[in-house]
Amino acid sequence: MKQKHFLISLTVLAIGISVDAQTKDNVKTTFQTSREWKPSIDNRADAVMVYGVGGNPSDKSRKLSFEERVKSWKERGYIIHFMTGIAWGEYQDYFTGQWDGKWHLDEGQVTQTGDTIWHGHMVPYIVPSENFLSYLKERHVKRVIDVGVDAIFMEEPEFWARAGYSDSFKKEWKKYYGFEWRPQHESPENTYLSSKLKYYLYYRALNEVFTFAKEYGKSKGMDVKCYVPTHSLVNYSQWQIVSPEASLASLPCVDGYIAQVWTGTSREPNFFDGRKRERVFETAYLEYGSMESMTAPTGRKMFFLTDPIEDWPRDWADYKKNYQATFTAQLLYPNIADYEVMPWPERIYEGLYRTSANSDKKERIPRFYSTQMQVMINALNRMPLTDKELTGSKGFSVLMANSLMFQRFPTHNGYEDPQLANFYGQALPLLKRGVPVKTVHIENLGYKEALADTKVLLMTYANMKPLEPEAHSHIADWVKKGGVLIYSGTDNDPFQNVREWWNTNGHNYATPSAHLFEQMGLPAWPNQGEYSYGKGTVCVIRTDPKDYVLHEGGDKYFLYLAARMYEQNAKAGKLEFKNNFYLQRGDYDLAAVLEESVSDEPFTVEGCLIDLFDPKLPIYTSKRINPGEQALLLNVERVAGKKKPQVLASASREEQEERGKGWYSYVAKSPAETSNVSRVLLPSCPKSVTVDGKEVFDTKRWHAASHTYLIEFENNPDGVSVKFCW
């Protein structure tokens, strides 16, 4: 009886705090939290993704009900969305029998040694059974929609490659394949079959849950949007996790993604020029790129995530350096302008982390860093789309496939692909020389836009396989019309021989590439060399691309051919090598200078520049960026409507802006216990500056050349009233 009474009470509460079935929200910035509103985490994004009906299992704080948490954020003016995990979460009532009277801990993902893979205490990574999906729909999705939330984010559909040994997985195997389970470690074919099933299970899970959410929402007069926050294909492949990724973009029930890229994913080491090391900026650039290209042809919405810290405990200086690298990388994609500005603000603003790499002393976020971070995320609130392009020779794309995740673990027959070197071997030799390499997903080749901007397509089947033969028709048609294909590969990895479409049902090809080459009139095993097909060219290199980066200087021949194919065959112009990237986005200048590149020269940006990576917001006429560094600058010279008083850069968000003859005022909101700094553009030097009615004018804070006034004060989530008179 108590449980029934509790559920009825929640229903009444839900009715009382309905978020009025938000229609079109136009959310540009968002964040996720399992906490109720607190002054110290009120970062003023457009929306908040309230995490979990039962919260976040990693959050040990006193937990309010979902409805109470929703109400607390709604009262502060936020658009309310919902996020939870699809592979793990606060689902103990399911695992311990409260849902249907049966325990379900046996539905966790299990390794060869019989160990369950845990996300936390009593929180296993899940084999998503039909019963579990019913639980998610009934206990979670319904409750969220009943409160009036009309955007659902189901994050991290993850099946570990090392898993696949539980009884629940064996049952799913029998249902899917029609024959008994086979241990994945015993053969490449078993590994491939196991990975395909893992891929399918989360494809089915998201399709079922999202389809239900949309139908249930429709029954209540709501248009429910559904999104998948997910790591990139690059990261999941490197971390040996299987996830549906690109295939989800074609589902009508999927409205978009969050690209979960941050320091923790991008600092995963890779090889280049024979050296294994962290390359945070370069990896982040490729991660964001793989997420953009996954959805670009489909028109789905994409949020890019950055995190000012990471899951692994490090020091504040490390967090700052790598945050700047990932933040810059995301902004180099001018066609994306929606952002998750941070995950878990409670962890960022209130967590304790080391003060230096060599110290065990821990402190909360330093004021200078919280100020800088808030300046950066408020820039995201203003960040425009742009038709400007990133500098560098355009037109190189690396082909990717979801099956990249299928060959990572376990290895067979001694064939290794260290740190995803077969992928990085095609991308880093060019990216490190200032060429803005893009990625293309083989699953998207049916969209005519997929290869529209590609001049030279780089591909291999050493680390992935085509799941459908139709992709080869699309590639062949593209080459015939003038495209240039560089195929690198010995085609001797153990997955070439798995039972798949190229060697079954009337097909008898030794390798999938043999089928591709046949489409273009080539022999099944063309020797290394250059071949013509229609107006295009096929260049075959009988080397696995991992060898381009595993050895010092191993990319010389690849680069020679890439340049010749680009300039002579694709007729795309001179292939330019440099050590930097630069992009203009509206008022903003973005720059990144590479280490391990063609030179150690710095890159210089000139103009009237506000440095947004410096919490003092200094102004420069020239900003020098050294190798290994990045810059986010606001160029005052490009600001539209210079006679209009406006905040150019700020560690707060402005509301209630008003302008009159000789005055300008606004209310600044930002988290408590943080410091504000703002550069405000004014037509002339002010005579009066007030903060909450108190006069604070200081002539030394006026910068005549930029016509900006620098103002600083303590932040307040309730708002600080600022007024300028001149």
Model-found features: residue ranges?
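A conserved amphipathic helix/loop scaffold
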Residues: 465-661, 678-680
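Catalytic domains of carbohydrate-active enzymes, especially glycoside hydrolases
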Residues: 26-68, 72, 142-151, 252-257, ...
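Helical hinge/lid and interdomain linker segments adjacent to catalytic or ligand-binding clefts
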Residues: 42-43, 417-503, 548, 598-599, ...
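The substrate-binding groove and active-site-proximal loops of carbohydrate-active enzymes
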Residues: 49-61, 117-135, 187-205, 232, ...
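Active-site-adjacent "subsite" loops/lids of carbohydrate-active enzymes
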Residues: 82-147, 181-199, 207
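Glycine-rich, aromatic-flanked loop segments that form ligand/cofactor-binding clefts
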Residues: 65-119, 150-161, 217-228
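Hydrophobic targeting/anchoring helices
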Residues: 41-44, 51-52, 155, 217, ...
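Aromatic-lined carbohydrate-recognition surfaces of secreted/lumenal glycan-active proteins
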Residues: 25-33, 81-85, 153-157, 192-241, ...
